[in-house]
């Protein structure tokens, strides 16, 4: 212990004398460990830390793969009768609960308590929270009586309770007015349970209501997402086989039972498993960054060790054995590593807070934090980093000390060929690793820009939207149409408005499908209820036929507009205008128009079949969204819309205008999140590599000053000297870039699943990265080369005792 204390004291004195290098090393280690700890915290939240439920490992997501056998699992819903079957017939599930999927954001309006506000409801079966092990912070959970009574029992989300209710614990038992109907608050959910953070990132749930399981809700069709809990000892494979067998049994109830093809997966896999490839890429990237950090610091310590060669040789001559010298130098490295880890921990705290508050729609991202596991990782990273970057200089310098002892002590400024080769190899490795990161970041960045540039089939820029509802609830059909007519009349007459329309579904939102059949041809298009003017307001181009008009109402024949994909599916090679499809309506629905295919679900998903119905003829919607496009700024447009709509409905929340482009941008936030992180790592790696090149070339110039002086004295021009140094710089950069491009070529094939619109061998990226690296390397070597070209040969040779010019 005394020896360790002595080593620490000696190391502190040594680092204090060379405070500039110590500061630079601490900063480099801090940035590296800060990035590593931040990425570990994200990976821990998304993939490693248990979900905030009781025994989360036994929870199972039960999806219906009815519309996509063989495709990736999705949240396709199931029927109430399917839930009953699993509850009553399964031996491997201890419980199965459901979540209603068709409540949309803003379906409900809170009034009578300050400014009207749009609320979003979640409906769940009464047994969901007990099954998950969720306990209320205040009040109680739902009871079977809450499901059947008319009291309107609700649970408030913790966020809504804190934001709107002012965190008042006395809210339990009080009533709120939602959609002009009183509801009773029976409890407040805990902060640890945030449904949207886990299952619907980027959205918001304000209150929860019980979902009844009865014949009425069963006849509504596929409406539920199911979560089950396995019995102790039950396996996923056995549960899958049992659920498949139960779904295949004949059903004796309602003949209109939908098909159920159960697909089971661990709940954790459903929540965040889709982000595993991205997290593996980020983890690998931060590993490369740490290797560059270690190589850079090894180079710094090797350079510093040359100036300490005399000191080390004296200690060896005084009896210090090689093991003691190595331990002393490793102690210095450990101090630098732990100082950097302290800085890195502060950076990780700030980084995780920033990521948790970002708008990236990634499950569990809001729960990213520096916890005990992250602290342990930081300590481990400090230990490993200190050993890795300190071991090579320690072994190399101690070996030199024992070979040279005091004999070469006066030549502390010289550097042997072996150590020079080692420093060059470290720089080459830095350049190669930086090249790999730059190629990966470049491919993802190119993919991201391709996503932004994709033709959506509509024009999101310049359009805003607001959820509107008739004030009378529930409105009659006549009241609803009159309300919508007046809203559209006011908006279309407002100054600066170019087009306005209504729709029940916004872009990049959950939508429903309807099955359609023409002869033997089938299609399941997404459906939208829209008004006249909607196509113009969204910038959707008609390919054939006409748009909806005011005359397309209950008094007229049922009409619809289809997109090119649906037309091709039902009437391939034929003109769809005038064709008809029979649905539930006594009369067939006639096609009056064809529009281009649109990427309404995500910008990355190819357009699929869609059908549009007149909002005047179809009642299958709740509230609708007003969409307006204007010639003025978005701020002026929203101000004008507030002025014209407020007299129509004083209870209409006017602070919830949304920009259509913002909705599209939010859908790309996970990809933007990955691109920004990887680009940051790549830039950091490039900076470290350039520092490494600068350090090696600068040190090479200082150690070869006599050689340069002799060349200058023999007639070499400053330009020739500078050229020679730059060639040495580019040689290191070229070797590193060549190795890095080969490794990047392999990496690019691994990350193909994360790319969009570019190939893994994208020549633009693979050409641009070497240009960037060689340019940066040239700049890094320019200053040392210019200094070498300006050396005075007379002064240089006088400083060399072997030249005979001393004195």
Can you say where each PLM-predicted feature lies in the sequence?
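Alpha-helical transmembrane segments of integral membrane proteins
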Residues: 1-22, 267-272, 300-327, 331, ...
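Nucleotide-cofactor and metal-assisted catalytic machinery
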Residues: 10, 22-24, 34-271, 353-366, ...
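Short, strongly hydrophobic transmembrane alpha-helices
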Residues: 18-46, 50, 292-295, 341, ...
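Conserved G/P- and acidic residue-centered "switch" motifs that form tight phosphate/ATP-binding loops
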Residues: 37, 139, 157, 187, ...
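Small-residue-rich transmembrane alpha-helices
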Residues: 42, 298, 334-405, 443-446, ...
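N-terminal membrane-entry
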Residues: 272-289, 373-377, 668-685, 727, ...
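Interfacial "coupling" helices/loops that link adjacent transmembrane helices in transporter permeases
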Residues: 293-337, 691-733, 737, 750, ...
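C-terminal transmembrane helical bundles of large multi-pass transporters
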Residues: 604, 640, 644, 650-741, ...
